[in-house]
Amino acid sequence: GSEMCIRDSNDNKVLYDFFATGEYDRNRDFILTTSPSMDILISSNLERLIYRIAGNDAAKNQELMSELKSQGRYGITDEMKKQLADFYGNYATEEENAATIKKLYEDTGYIIDTHTGVAATVYEKYKKDTGDTTKTVIASTASPYKFTRSVLTAIDPKYDSMGDFELVDELNRLSGVDIPKAIEDIRTAPVLHDTVCEVNEMCDNVKRILGIN
């Protein structure tokens, strides 16, 4: 059978909508989720795919990217959309992601991070939608230790009352996976920056920290 590329999104599902409709529209609310690396309105990688499905037409590619910049949206032709037939797209809500993390832990004892949770959720949707049971490897892109609170509260809400390093120790106990040295070292590392500022003060604060007038 043909190979499929499974494309997953979180609640910021601009890419899901693009693959479903052929229209890319960033004019929407930006949602903060527990999988922040996927919190996007503009996909930096999609431009390369657009170039390919436009027949390596740099001028067409530039036209669409200019539309995105000026209008916040663009649409591809039916001919271009046909070339996306090997892509399956879906998305995972915050609730679905948390449920996947919890179920996988309860079924296997393995704890995944929130981005892998999105992938695993969408993979299950893919299997349900297509009936394809091909053996599939999901490559985790991050350690659950980077997202201890989100991961553990998905397993049990009681963990939300614990401190950050208590959560690190609890994740170690539940998973049996060693605490990464970089995180272990934070326990005793001196706090270098403790400035809290408003968004409109960020530029001035960065300049001050760097000694730039």
Question: Which residues does each predicted region cover?
Answer:
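Conserved phosphate/anionic-ligand binding catalytic regions in large, soluble enzymes, centered on
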Residues: 39-49, 109-119, 139-146
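Short gly/pro/ser/thr-enriched loop/turn and capping motifs at secondary-structure boundaries
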Residues: 11-16, 144-147
